[in-house]
């Protein structure tokens, strides 16, 4: 019976895991820390095309995967910081723009990339460290047009208004914990991985952070 289960499981695994494409550029160096050349992935649908996005130590790569028998890299944006010092990038999209960050390098920036013309081309419309340089993770609450930047400044997490998608504006800094590793936010309710400080649920409703310059912790 055990042998049968193992064989059945093996056959089932082969049936559901069918590799349809592999891309690996040997010219892209791995990180010094972990030897990882690639670090993050994201996906969008633009102009009826399915686009896969992958981060590397060199920057951000865009692939048209609409036709799985003809997948190709259609665009590339070099990171502000590149090379073996890069371990981690992160992405999120909003209203036809891709927001890209890197967690390493003094020259890192927030990059905002216009992806509305994919799969033909992309265009970097913002590339600056005026708001922050490095960030471990970002999340965009699309319902409220807010970008949450984790561990990007002296604060655990910062919140930016994306009413103007190409000109983010800082509206609040959260500093109740030492570090926010990652976040998921829906309608201003943030579910936060706070590392050594555990898991927290926080309400960042505009009425709280604007008028009271405060937030409401719902659970921890």
Question: Over which residues does each language-model region extend?
Answer:
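Feature marking well-ordered beta-strand scaffolds used for ligand recognition
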Residues: 13-220
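Bacterial Sec-dependent N-terminal signal peptides
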Residues: 1-16
